[in-house]
């Protein structure tokens, strides 16, 4: 219940403009002590909210990874398309957390990227792509990490507070980099969606 209320308030007011007291006021008499028994700070609440979203994201990644009708390259393209198109992304960018001032959140993203998403979802797909001939690399582990670090961190406007123009330029570099690996897996529709999410974030930060 705490996470549901917190997430709703984060959406309505933005993370930076929501206080612990705001959350308590919506919990029907639950005391501040009860909140702090489970969460030491507002940042801890945000981390828990994002972790719940990560579970849903992992389910999507697993479903694509386990499909038998796609090549490795096709699976990577599907993952990027589905990840950026999910409506929950609008919610995340509306909450507009400041990653630079919330180190636990940033560490959690890096930890999930390197220790979970890359080895458990992207790496098996790259290995499949090597086997079926759709992906060429001698360094599958490093490529899996590189793809996600660039997509989840470097291209993330919530981390570097990128403008729409900066997001466009980063996307084009990412696109060229992927093409250099023979991975033509991102297209103009994905670019338009990234610009849209950047705009949502910038408006939420105002």
Kindly label every feature range from the protein language model.
Residues 48, 62-95, 144-147:
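Hydrophobic alpha-helical connector segments
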Residues 9-44, 48:
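Helix-turn-helix
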Residues 3-4, 16-17, 38-62, 77-81:
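An amphipathic alpha-helix adjacent to DNA-recognition modules
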Residues 88-134:
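Short secondary-structure transition hinges
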Residues 127, 131-132, 163-206:
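C-terminal peripheral helix-coil segments that are non-catalytic and often amphipathic
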Residues 61, 117-147, 151, 155-162:
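Hydrophobic alpha-helical bundle segments that form small-molecule/ligand-binding pockets
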Residues 30, 56, 86-94, 129, ...:
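A short secondary-structure junction motif
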Residues 2, 6-10:
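Short hydrophobic clusters on alpha-helical segments that form packing/core surfaces
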């Amino acid at each position: 219940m705490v996470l549901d209320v917190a997430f709703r308030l984060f959406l309505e007011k933005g993370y930076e403009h929501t206080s612990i007291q705001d959350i308590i006021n919506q919990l029907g008499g639950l005391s501040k002590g009860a909140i702090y028994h489970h969460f030491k700070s507002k940042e801890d609440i945000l981390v828990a909210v994002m972790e719940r979203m990560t579970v849903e994201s992992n389910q999507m990644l697993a479903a694509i990874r386990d499909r038998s009708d796609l090549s490795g390259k096709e699976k990577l393209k599907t993952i990027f398309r589905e990840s950026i198109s999910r409506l929950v992304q609008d919610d995340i960018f509306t909450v507009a957390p400041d990653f630079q001032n919330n180190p636990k959140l940033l560490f959690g993203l890096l930890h999930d990227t390197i220790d979970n998403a890359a080895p458990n979802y992207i790496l098996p797909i790259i290995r499949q792509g090597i086997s079926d001939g759709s992906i060429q690399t001698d360094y599958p582990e490093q490529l899996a990490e590189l793809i996600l670090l660039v997509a989840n961190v470097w291209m993330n406007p919530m981390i570097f507070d990128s403008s729409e123009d900066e997001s466009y330029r980063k996307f084009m570099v990412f696109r060229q980099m992927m093409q250099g690996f023979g991975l033509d897996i991102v297209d103009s529709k994905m670019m338009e969606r990234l610009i849209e999410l950047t705009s949502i974030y910038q408006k939420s930060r105002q």
